[in-house]
Amino acid sequence: IKEASGYPQQAAQITSCELPEDFVVLSGDDALTVPFIQNGAEGVISVVGNAYPRLFSHLTHLAMEGRINEADMIQTEMRAINTQLFQEGNPVGIKALLYLMRLIDSNSLRLPLVPASSELSERLDTTRKALDVYASHLFA
Protein backbone atom coordinates (compact mmCIF):
# COMPACT_ATOMS: atom_id res chain seq x y z
CA ILE A 1 0.00 0.00 0.00
CA LYS A 2 1.20 3.53 -0.76
CA GLU A 3 0.88 5.46 2.49
CA ALA A 4 0.74 9.20 1.82
CA SER A 5 -1.26 10.47 4.78
CA GLY A 6 1.56 12.72 5.94
CA TYR A 7 1.68 10.80 9.22
CA PRO A 8 4.62 8.37 9.37
CA GLN A 9 3.06 6.77 12.47
CA GLN A 10 0.32 5.49 10.16
CA ALA A 11 2.88 3.08 8.64
CA ALA A 12 3.61 1.72 12.12
CA GLN A 13 -0.10 1.25 12.81
CA ILE A 14 -0.57 -0.63 9.54
CA THR A 15 2.48 -2.86 9.91
CA SER A 16 1.57 -3.71 13.52
CA CYS A 17 -1.56 -5.47 12.27
CA GLU A 18 -1.69 -9.08 11.16
CA LEU A 19 -1.02 -8.80 7.44
CA PRO A 20 -0.45 -11.19 4.55
CA GLU A 21 3.23 -12.11 4.15
CA ASP A 22 3.50 -10.27 0.83
CA PHE A 23 1.87 -7.05 2.11
CA VAL A 24 4.21 -4.06 1.86
CA VAL A 25 3.83 -0.48 3.06
CA LEU A 26 5.56 2.14 0.92
CA SER A 27 6.00 5.83 1.66
CA GLY A 28 4.10 8.02 -0.76
CA ASP A 29 5.65 11.25 0.49
CA ASP A 30 9.21 12.02 -0.64
CA ALA A 31 9.78 14.55 2.12
CA LEU A 32 8.85 12.01 4.82
CA THR A 33 10.59 8.94 3.42
CA VAL A 34 13.03 8.58 6.31
CA PRO A 35 10.42 8.76 9.09
CA PHE A 36 8.09 6.45 7.15
CA ILE A 37 10.87 3.86 6.86
CA GLN A 38 11.62 4.30 10.57
CA ASN A 39 7.96 3.44 11.16
CA GLY A 40 7.91 0.26 9.09
CA ALA A 41 7.64 1.30 5.44
CA GLU A 42 9.79 -0.85 3.17
CA GLY A 43 10.44 1.70 0.44
CA VAL A 44 8.92 4.65 -1.38
CA ILE A 45 6.94 5.56 -4.47
CA SER A 46 8.81 8.72 -5.33
CA VAL A 47 8.29 11.82 -7.46
CA VAL A 48 11.71 13.42 -6.94
CA GLY A 49 13.34 10.06 -7.65
CA ASN A 50 12.47 10.59 -11.31
CA ALA A 51 14.87 13.53 -11.40
CA TYR A 52 17.41 12.33 -8.83
CA PRO A 53 17.28 8.52 -8.93
CA ARG A 54 20.79 7.94 -7.59
CA LEU A 55 20.53 10.47 -4.76
CA PHE A 56 17.05 9.43 -3.67
CA SER A 57 17.85 5.73 -3.94
CA HIS A 58 20.91 6.31 -1.77
CA LEU A 59 18.80 8.16 0.82
CA THR A 60 16.25 5.33 0.84
CA HIS A 61 18.86 2.60 1.18
CA LEU A 62 20.59 4.45 4.01
CA ALA A 63 17.29 4.73 5.88
CA MET A 64 16.50 1.06 5.29
CA GLU A 65 19.96 0.12 6.62
CA GLY A 66 19.25 2.12 9.79
CA ARG A 67 21.76 4.83 8.91
CA ILE A 68 19.23 7.48 9.83
CA ASN A 69 21.60 10.41 10.46
CA GLU A 70 23.11 10.05 6.98
CA ALA A 71 19.69 9.65 5.38
CA ASP A 72 18.38 12.69 7.29
CA MET A 73 21.26 14.83 6.00
CA ILE A 74 20.32 14.02 2.41
CA GLN A 75 16.61 14.48 3.17
CA THR A 76 17.44 17.93 4.57
CA GLU A 77 19.38 18.86 1.43
CA MET A 78 16.38 17.79 -0.66
CA ARG A 79 13.81 19.71 1.41
CA ALA A 80 13.59 22.72 -0.92
CA ILE A 81 13.21 20.68 -4.10
CA ASN A 82 10.58 18.45 -2.47
CA THR A 83 8.59 21.52 -1.43
CA GLN A 84 8.90 23.26 -4.78
CA LEU A 85 7.84 20.19 -6.77
CA PHE A 86 4.34 20.40 -5.31
CA GLN A 87 3.83 24.18 -5.14
CA GLU A 88 1.77 24.19 -8.32
CA GLY A 89 0.54 20.62 -8.09
CA ASN A 90 1.73 17.28 -9.35
CA PRO A 91 2.93 16.59 -12.07
CA VAL A 92 3.55 20.27 -12.89
CA GLY A 93 6.69 20.61 -10.76
CA ILE A 94 8.40 17.36 -11.71
CA LYS A 95 7.68 17.93 -15.39
CA ALA A 96 9.27 21.40 -15.16
CA LEU A 97 12.29 20.01 -13.31
CA LEU A 98 12.82 17.19 -15.80
CA TYR A 99 12.60 19.73 -18.61
CA LEU A 100 15.15 22.01 -16.91
CA MET A 101 17.44 19.01 -16.54
CA ARG A 102 17.00 18.29 -20.26
CA LEU A 103 15.68 14.83 -19.46
CA ILE A 104 12.46 15.47 -21.40
CA ASP A 105 11.84 17.51 -24.54
CA SER A 106 8.76 19.43 -23.41
CA ASN A 107 7.16 20.62 -20.21
CA SER A 108 3.69 20.74 -21.76
CA LEU A 109 0.79 19.09 -19.96
CA ARG A 110 -2.72 18.12 -20.97
CA LEU A 111 -5.53 20.46 -19.98
CA PRO A 112 -6.72 21.36 -17.45
CA LEU A 113 -3.10 21.34 -16.24
CA VAL A 114 -0.72 24.03 -17.40
CA PRO A 115 3.08 24.21 -17.28
CA ALA A 116 4.85 25.61 -14.24
CA SER A 117 4.97 29.38 -13.88
CA SER A 118 8.18 31.13 -14.81
CA GLU A 119 8.67 31.98 -11.12
CA LEU A 120 8.50 28.34 -10.05
CA SER A 121 10.71 27.28 -12.96
CA GLU A 122 13.34 29.80 -11.86
CA ARG A 123 13.21 28.58 -8.25
CA LEU A 124 13.44 24.96 -9.38
CA ASP A 125 16.41 25.77 -11.59
CA THR A 126 18.26 27.52 -8.76
CA THR A 127 17.52 24.70 -6.34
CA ARG A 128 18.43 22.08 -8.95
CA LYS A 129 21.85 23.63 -9.47
CA ALA A 130 22.59 23.64 -5.74
CA LEU A 131 21.38 20.05 -5.36
CA ASP A 132 23.51 18.98 -8.33
CA VAL A 133 26.60 20.42 -6.60
CA TYR A 134 25.67 18.66 -3.35
CA ALA A 135 25.17 15.32 -5.14
CA SER A 136 28.42 15.66 -7.07
CA HIS A 137 30.32 16.08 -3.79
CA LEU A 138 28.44 13.25 -2.11
CA PHE A 139 29.28 10.80 -4.89
CA ALA A 140 32.79 12.09 -5.66
Residue spans of the language-model regions?
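Ligand/cofactor pocket segment of small-molecule handling proteins
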Residues: I1-I37, E42
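Structured C-terminal cap/extension of enzyme domains
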Residues: A31-A140
